[in-house]
Each structure stands twice: as structure tokens, then as C-alpha cells.
Regions:
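A short, surface-exposed helix-loop junction/capping segment
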Residues: 5-16
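Long, well-structured alpha-helical subdomains associated
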Residues: 10, 21, 65, 106-153
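Active-site scaffold of zinc-dependent metalloenzymes
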Residues: 14-15, 19-22, 30-67, 80-83
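Catalytic Zn2+-binding segment of zinc metalloproteases
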Residues: 62-63, 77-95
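Short alpha-helical catalytic segment bearing the HExxH-like zincin motif
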Residues: 68-76
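An active-site-proximal "capping" alpha-helix that borders the catalytic cofactor pocket
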Residues: 90-106
Length: 153
């Protein structure tokens, strides 16, 4: 089985945006929410995405103060509209991070990549600690991008 690799994921814009820094990242999240019909429902330190019955989409995200909180917001949007939303937990988390990387308006810093990797390591530890259960969480196959995302740091 071949090891997982990530395609080049940073989205290069054809025309550079005029906004910079946090203002650019906030505007990008607002644009995505408008585009996909997602309601920003307050603040959450860790981020949360909810798909309500009737089709209402909602995210709670931390205030965007820098890249890590921006990528958390993109990740939550990815849970609602990205590919692989209904995959098992670890794969769904990886898929949401892939959405964040593919749709970001800024190139991720090494600190952002470390943050993504650490968060996925936490989910992997969670899954490994529950392998004794009657229905254990599924650990992704070796060729899933989950494993390449773990190597970002």
C-alpha cells in the first residue's frame, strides 16, 4: 500500500486581494458563510459546526486573531460543506482540514501546520484509546490523507 501524500493545496488567487492580515481572513470567512448559507452563531473557543434539521447550517468559531483561529474557522466550514463530511470521525476531521488548506486565502505558516497536526494527533490518541470497545472508532487506512496531515509539523 502506498503512503498517503497531499496534493499542493494552497489556493493561489488570480488577482491579489487588497485586504491584509486578520481583516482579510475575517472577510474570507464571512464570504464563505454567505456563499454556502452558513450562519455565524456566536463564539466558541474550539469551534463547532452544526447541521440542523431543515438544512440550516451554523458554525461557532473563536474570534479570528491570527492564522490558527482562521484555519479553525475554515475547518468548521469544511465540516458542513467539504468533501467527506459523513466519513468516520478521524477521516472527517482530516477532510475538514483539507478543505481549510485548499480554500485558505493565505498560505499556512509552520505554526498553523503544527496546530493542525497536533489536533489530528489528539484525535488519533482518542481513537487508539477506544479500540477495546465493542464498536471501536475507525482508524484511517494508510493511504488516507489523514496520515500526510499528521506529518505537517
Amino acid at each position: 500500500m502506498e503512503a498517503a501524500t497531499l496534493p499542493p493545496v494552497f489556493r493561489q488567487e488570480k488577482a491579489p486581494r487588497t485586504r491584509k492580515g486578520v481583516e482579510l481572513m475575517e472577510a474570507h470567512i464571512e464570504d464563505l458563510c454567505r456563499e454556502y448559507g452558513i450562519e455565524l452563531a456566536g463564539s466558541s473557543a474550539r469551534g463547532r459546526a452544526i447541521r440542523w434539521r431543515g438544512g440550516k447550517l451554523e458554525i461557532s468559531i473563536p474570534p479570528i486573531r491570527g492564522q490558527v483561529s482562521y484555519f479553525i474557522a475554515l475547518h468548521e466550514v469544511g465540516h458542513l460543506v467539504g468533501k467527506g463530511r459523513s466519513a468516520p470521525r478521524l477521516e472527517s476531521e482530516a477532510n475538514a482540514w483539507l478543505f481549510a488548506l485548499e480554500n485558505s486565502a493565505v498560505e499556512p505558516t509552520s505554526a498553523t501546520k503544527r496546530s493542525i497536526s497536533r489536533r489530528l494527533e489528539g484525535y488519533l490518541a482518542w481513537a487508539r484509546n477506544r479500540q477495546h470497545r465493542r464498536v471501536p472508532p475507525r482508524i484511517p487506512p494508510r493511504d488516507h490523507p489523514f496520515w500526510a496531515l499528521l506529518q505537517l509539523s
